Amino acid sequence: MQYKKGFTLIELMIVVVVIAIIAAIAIPSYAAYIQRKDLALAKQEALRIATELEKFKAKNFSYKGFDATYLYTGYAPSTGTLAIPVDGSDTKFTLTLLDLATKKSLSIQRGQDGNETADSSSVRGLNWVIRVERAKTGTTLKQPRNYDLLLTSEGVRCQTRTPDMVSTYTCGTTNNENW
């Protein structure tokens, strides 16, 4: 009597179906985890800058002149922008720090003559706003199911999934929540 060793086609099909079911559950869960991690990192960086802004104001009595390049080498003081994550990997969010009243960078900008520029001199630095918006590839959001964030010195902390809805003062009127 000879014994045949191996698996039948039915047994192999069952294994393939089980693996497909596990993958169908695991992959979306992993993607959601990655988006939550990226959002937590964006919130952490926004709160870190907010803390540094308050320290700066305690010493200087104004937010004007704040420059985050001592914290982040990728911070652009002329525009007040920072790519998140800051380690230089694929950008998920763009953080923008501006004066609340003028919507211009808080950093002091100097012209070629060494004097402060007109745009920079219009900044009083009494309040600030931090917008954290999802990065885009062309016109497509990299993480369409994630949030855009808003944080201000006046205590506004909101987030929204609606793209391009975050302004200087609000996260829009629909589909937003506090964080």
Task: List PLM regions with ranges.
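Alpha-helix exit/C-cap motif
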Residues: 36-40, 47, 51-72
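N-terminal single-pass transmembrane signal-anchor helix
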Residues: 1-34
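Periplasmic/extracellular, small/polar-rich flexible segments of pilin-like filament-forming proteins
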Residues: 59-179
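Short, charge- and proline-biased low-complexity linear segments
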Residues: 45-51, 77-82
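Residues at secondary-structure transition points
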Residues: 4, 36-40, 44, 119, ...
